[in-house]
Amino acid sequence: MSSGGAGIADMQVRFDGCPALSGLLRGAGCKKGNRMESRDDPVVIRHRELERYANAALKAGRIMMESGASVSVVHRGITMIARGFGVETIGMRSGYTSIAMTVHVADQTITRMLQVGRLGVNHRLDLAVRQLCARAEKGGMSVEEVEAELARLVRETPRHPAWFTAVAVGLACASFGRLLGVDWLAFGPVWLAGAIGQYLRHHLLHRGVNIFIVAGAIAFLSATLGGLGAIALQSATVQLAMMASILLLVPGVPSTNAQTDIMDGYPTIGSARAVWVLMIMLFAATGVWFAEELLGTRG
């Protein structure tokens, strides 16, 4: 059997006595012919080009959303890339876990959707992708170039080491604690408790542990460590020290984005972000409650 077409023809002759099978084989030959014709169909070719444009723009939007950008910023970046490819964006929809867009050129229209991963905060990567969107909007960049640049940015954008971030976060917790009224005796314990909590949170999240469980566990651990340190040093602000030790869990960027999205006319994802913030605070409060019960510091 030298080829698919020849093989079908041979089988049609061989099973001439079976009309049903002969019809089935003729149908298979027609389907193969249709597939070959579709490869050269200009409509199909243009459809695939639109699909590539949409996917490249959506990838940029997904990275921005996962890096902490608001919906309006994400939509603007996606539109800029699509415009650079010479297509018109006629519709976009963002959910908490997905983004979709519809692009149009001439008489061709296509809709595509990408799933969005865990939403975090990475302002360096967010800014780098925004700058790429601005370059792509000017034209002259192919789909391959845009996708390659996105991959490079994800791979090479500098990130602070986990230990450095932990030390900085711990210092921030202690500094905010001072503003809240924590005395100097509790400053060191709060710094240490916040740093340990941030370091463990970083590794737990990268291992895929549920973010709400992490919030509750880290709140309990950091509050307990901060409280024990304050008690050991005979601080007069033990409860404040325990509260300051968990300030690392306050979801500042998601809270701001929730308000921004609702005010910008995206109430669905804004409400989803707000519920997420409330859940984080609920689990954090539960962790602190258990820590206070353990140390006997509840009034």
Positions of predicted regions on the chain:
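Serine residues within intrinsically disordered or low-complexity segments
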Residues: 2-3, 22
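Alpha-helical transmembrane segments and their membrane-interface boundaries
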Residues: 107, 117-299
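Short hydrophobic transmembrane-like helices used for membrane targeting/insertion
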Residues: 1, 8-13
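Soluble N-terminal domains of membrane-associated systems
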Residues: 11-141
